[in-house]
Amino acid sequence: PSTGEAALLVEQTGFTSQQSRDRIRMVIAAVQNLPGVTVITHEAYTPEEVDFLWSLPERVVPLLMRLPGPTHPLPFVEDVAVPPEALHDFLVRAQNVFKKHEVTSSLYAHAAAGQLHMRPFLTHPTSADAQRLENIARDLYQVVFSVGGTISGEHGDGLSRTSFLRSQYGSLYTVFKQIKQIFDPHNLMNPGKIISDDPHLTIKNLRPRVVPSAELPPPLMNWSWDRISDEAARCNGCGACRTQDEDQRMCPLFRTTHLEEASPRAKANLMRHIAAGNLDHELMASEEFKRVADLCFNCKQCEKECPTNVNIP
């Protein structure tokens, strides 16, 4: 229902369909007796219904990224995991962290594993307010550590979490450094990741917010330069649109040509630089610009499969 505060998908298996039904109804009976909450349940047993319900979590990020407004759910603390028995305490304390910093955060999770994806709603940061992101991460991770959790439960540590690994692993971090020195003494492999003395690595490589140049001509169609800038800003340059995986469909033209300019992110970068005034807007009337623009036939597979659902067409 639209008034619901949360939803939880629970799957039970059995050797027979009746055994699965009995187990599901035991779960329902248990949660309906919880004090102080109203629980509405829906049972699904056909393959079509089950597949539909399990498809719902896949729609969370696309829906979040398409929400209108100046703020966006930024994925910089989205991979924490805590012991399942500590979930209740952690969620209360995590909400207090967001209240302290006056932000709202989305939340979806793999509850049985204690895996939480939190995305605070913030504007794309400028160099002046980037410190806010680091402060939110630091305060939230302190809560994670205090309940025996990890800041990287499902994905890699990467640049955004490297600065906090020393706090998570303590003296064991020295062993990480020794291993790095043995196998990569010249720091050639993924420099700056996992092993780094930079305390501000989380915000060091942020892509700044683009403010459209005042010299841009007014668009002739029903769009604005602010809208173009916001859409281009959704691209973080991860390169997922260059995938060759057989279970994905983006980007057909890049798969055929293997040219960077054919990739969706190339168009986002091009429009970002034009909007910012780094490139002359008259470039859009050139043959070179048309050649890049023509490397898209509006199939919208990038919008469907991009991690941040950038609508390149």
Where are these regions (language model features)?
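A glycine-rich phosphate-binding loop feature that marks nucleotide/adenosyl-phosphate handling sites
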Residues: 1, 42-58, 108-121, 153-165, ...
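Flexible, glycine/charged-enriched surface loops at secondary-structure junctions
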Residues: 1, 31-53, 104-108, 147-154, ...
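Terminal amphipathic helices with adjacent charged low-complexity linkers/tails
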Residues: 1-71, 109-111, 195, 256-271, ...
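Short, hydrophobic beta-strand segments
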Residues: 4-14, 68-80, 116-124, 159-167
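Activity-critical C-terminal alpha-helical subdomain
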Residues: 63-67, 71, 168-225, 233
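Extended, hydrophobic alpha-helical segments in both membrane/secreted and soluble proteins
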Residues: 84-94, 101-161, 175-179, 231, ...
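Ferredoxin-type iron-sulfur electron-transfer modules in oxidoreductases and energy-metabolism complexes
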Residues: 201, 206-238, 242-313
